[in-house]
């Protein structure tokens, strides 16, 4: 049985292709001048034998062969001795209306070993229908657009470096033109993706995270869904932007929690570090340690202590009661307690051994070694200068016992207690004036003295005792003393 049976002519819309008037002679061989490669079939399964072309490469260019290759399974065949297209069972001859007549922008130059169909381009002044010729006919005049159905798509994804290397080399004598793949695959312009190089492992890797994929489309979708920031995903409180709305919702929950509130003002924040920075910037002077010698402020006691070391050791602390001076504040405190304790006393309103109003000589100032402060024992007032504490005690805590007996040195907080104390000395026949140095052995002499010597300065006289006052208000405040007694 003949391996290549005769085929009946197929009538088309272009009968001139197969008419004798075309002026092209046909070969009367086993094919009867008609290609038997099922060129009009939708699915052609026969492919040429690759060994046939390998043998042809070794032959001389002057040798010719009219023998057609044997077809096995799947690629195109070409005759290297003639510059025209050799029909192949894989090639589909397309009508000139299948593609635009304009040249594709994606035409590339490849070497002889590429798998794309080869054709010799010749400029024609007029577009004419595609004519099919035999292997021994004259070179083809019309450009034939062809594409392989099982063309490997991966071969076209060459890197930019490889394409540059090929263009730098001297172009081969035979050029092959590749049809735009987007036209063959019906890919629209919106679906085209930019060419990216995969890494050494053949994966497309996300530059913002650890995501990687074998396909660039997956990477593109990942970038849009995960890393595309929009103005709608911005926090209204802190103005921070997020890639997804889900992350924004999670972040917004932080602002709903109980914020850190500044105790000095109405400032609020959900971050503790921000609150600390706010206090340091805004309320820095509200909680400072300061040096009373040079009026320099510090934010911590340790910084203040270091500042004290900077003061010259020749700086002296002076006693306010005498001419004693020292460069050690603790030594000054000890001096005041030991030498001037009588000037730093307090009145005890409690009965002490049955005697009311007796003074107890207690120190009102102590020295805190840890914090380097002089502290008032009565109210807790503190200062780094001993003179400040002494002044405080003299003003705030000594005005309540101004009456001191000249005979025994006892002091009293009120004139009534002082007068009662003076009566204790009457048994001895001595009467003392509480306003001056006058003394007498008769009570009547004392009353006359008060009326003449102190009536001008103290016009308001108490009817129950010998007390006199400079104004009526002091007298009124004195009268309740007699009501309690």
UniProtKB/Swiss-Prot annotation:
A zinc finger (C2H2-type) spans 204-227, 233-255, 260-283, 289-311, 374-397, 403-425, 431-454, 460-482. GO terms for cellular component: nucleoplasm; nucleus. Residues 1-20 are annotated as: Disordered. One of its GO terms (biological process) is regulation of transcription by RNA polymerase II. Residues 1-14 have a biased composition (Basic residues). The keyword Ribosomal protein does not apply. The modification Phosphoserine is found at residues 60, 88. The keyword Kinase does not apply. GO terms for molecular function: DNA-binding transcription activator activity, RNA polymerase II-specific; DNA-binding transcription factor activity; RNA polymerase II cis-regulatory region sequence-specific DNA binding; transcription cis-regulatory region binding; zinc ion binding. There is a cross-link at residues 76, 177, 181, 226 (Glycyl lysine isopeptide (Lys-Gly) (interchain with G-Cter in SUMO2)). It is found in: Nucleus. Residues 371-455 are annotated as: Interaction with CTNNA2. Keywords: DNA-binding, Isopeptide bond, Metal-binding, Nucleus, Phosphoprotein, Repeat, Repressor, Transcription, Transcription regulation, Ubl conjugation, Zinc, Zinc-finger. Its main location: nucleus. PANTHER family: C2H2-TYPE DOMAIN-CONTAINING PROTEIN (PTHR24379:SF121), KRAB AND ZINC FINGER DOMAIN-CONTAINING (PTHR24379). Belongs to the krueppel C2H2-type zinc-finger protein family. Interacts with CTNNA2. Binds DNA and may function as a transcriptional repressor. This is Zinc finger protein 639. It comes from Bos taurus (Bovine).
